[in-house]
Amino acid sequence: MDTSEGIYFVRHNNRAVLATIRRDGSPQQSPVTVGLVDEAIVMSTRETAYKVRNLRRDPRAWLCVVTDGWYGQWVQLSCTTEVVSLPDAMDGLVAYYRALSGEHPDWGDYRRAMVEDQRCLVRFTVLAAGPDVAG
């Protein structure tokens, strides 16, 4: 599967399991919501999350993206990542929200919540994609 096909799959499927690498080399997995902003895969998370600590140490990551129904087609994406912290992350966090949910009723409130929750943005660069499997 071409990487562009894997990225296209995310346009219509936002549920994923993210795998990062712990300090001891074992996998750490988290259910996440990914979105597509300017043809790049992104997600929002907390600065204090283990996945962020892992990605800052080792930027390799794997996403298993699934449909909303869970069973059916899925795609695995091998990636490198960039963690963007506030305040630099704010525009990306707004774009992420818009990509998934449209307009927010109070953008000021949203921005305050991002600061209070210590949110950051993770950008994924897809290196390989596949297989596209139904199961």
Please tell me what each predicted stretch does:
Residues T3-S4, T48-A49, W107-G108:
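Structural motif corresponding to alpha-helix initiation and N-cap regions
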Residues M1-A16:
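Short, basic/aromatic recognition patches
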Residues Y8-R11, R56-R57, V115:
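Alpha-helix boundary recognition
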